[in-house]
């Protein structure tokens, strides 16, 4: 249904929002920035400063992983450069000049968050980290994630003359949706990120075991995929794909505490799962804090949302309302 509204558009949306808010109270989160995406209808169900540019640490690695899966074979042998071997902790300890199987590096990157694995993967596929970063940003752009700018494959903080390494909670949700469900390599991505333990033996006979740090896999029965992250700038971060009660959702939590608040992200994640599964209708409105002028045209074309019907994500990003700010 299409309706036309004039300058009272904000008041109209507020009225609708308040009536719907009564059904499901919004969660109070620790995260500075957060988003919850209804992945079946491409609608943001919850947002908190979700369009703010934020450092996102190792959650970057979900895009590194899917781009690697789409542009290489798991059997590829990856030769380690001096730069790859010299990456800071957390790292596997790759040896310069040695070659490792792509599959082993992907599991090391996604389960243990090893920075040297991510760097070696990037150099193997892109030729250089700079060119691989261009591949990441091109993929983000193809997904409509225009507020994402990645400079490193492992999420370590960096900046150039254009900007700093960042994304937004909204963009990160959309990236996870693509990784978990929409890519032709989503099945492989899910398999890697759902694995609790992975072991391999390198060519020197050293046995390695990787353990998955995504606690939501064991603390809930609905986690399809997830990735943690931390830097001193980004704080604790988390992105996940969730499927519960026939509903698919993606969540992103950025700036979710600093030491000693490592568990804040798990608390916030569970709150968003509860909120998302108890919300009967998906909805999206104008976010509080946006300037009135953004919606102050003499005539605006607005598509109303009804359950189980599609609405464009780009439209929803324009009309996103954080209801609790109106109380």
Regions found by a protein language model. Give the residues of each.
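Sec-dependent N-terminal signal peptides of Gram-positive bacterial secreted proteins and lipoproteins
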Residues: 2-25, 327
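Hydrophobic alpha-helical segments, especially transmembrane helices
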Residues: 8-9, 62, 244
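Short amphipathic beta-strand/extended segments with alternating polar/hydrophobic composition
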Residues: 13, 47-49, 210
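Active-site-adjacent loops and short helices of periplasmic peptidoglycan-processing enzymes
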Residues: 20-184
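Domain-terminus/edge residues, biased toward the C-terminal soluble/receptor-binding domains
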Residues: 145-146, 161-327
């Amino acid at each position: 249904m299409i309706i036309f509204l004039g300058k009272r558009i904000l008041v109209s949306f507020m009225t609708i929002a308040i009536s719907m808010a009564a059904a499901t109270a919004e969660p109070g989160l620790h995260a500075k920035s957060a988003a919850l995406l209804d992945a079946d209808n491409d609608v943001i169900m919850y947002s908190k400063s979700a369009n703010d540019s934020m450092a996102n640490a190792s959650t970057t690695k979900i895009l590194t992983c899917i781009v690697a899966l789409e542009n290489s074979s798991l059997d590829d042998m990856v030769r380690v450069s001096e730069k790859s071997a010299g990456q800071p902790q957390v790292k596997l300890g790759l040896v310069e000049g040695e070659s490792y199987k792509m599959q082993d590096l992907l599991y090391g990157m996604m389960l243990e968050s090893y920075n040297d694995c991510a760097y070696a993967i990037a150099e193997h596929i892109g030729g250089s980290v700079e060119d691989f970063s261009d591949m990441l940003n091109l993929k983000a752009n193809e997904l409509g994630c225009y507020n994402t700018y990645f400079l490193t494959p492992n999420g370590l903080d960096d900046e150039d003359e254009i900007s700093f390494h960042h994304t937004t909670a909204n963009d990160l949700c959309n990236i996870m949706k693509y990784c978990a469900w929409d890519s032709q390599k989503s099945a492989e991505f899910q398999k890697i990120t759902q694995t609790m333990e992975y072991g391999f033996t390198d060519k020197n006979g050293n046995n390695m075991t990787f353990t998955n740090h995504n606690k939501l896999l064991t603390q809930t029965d609905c986690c399809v995929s997830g990735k943690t992250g931390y830097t001193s700038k980004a704080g604790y971060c988390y992105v996940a794909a969730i499927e519960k009660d026939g509903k698919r959702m993606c969540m992103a939590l950025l700036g979710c505490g600093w030491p000693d608040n490592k568990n804040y992200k798990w608390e916030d994640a569970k709150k968003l799962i509860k909120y998302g599964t108890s919300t009967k209708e998906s909805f999206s409105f104008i976010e509080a804090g946006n300037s009135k002028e953004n919606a102050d045209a003499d005539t605006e074309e607005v598509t109303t949302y009804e359950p189980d019907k599609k609405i464009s994500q780009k439209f929803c990003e324009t009309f996103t309302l954080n209801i609790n700010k109106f109380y």
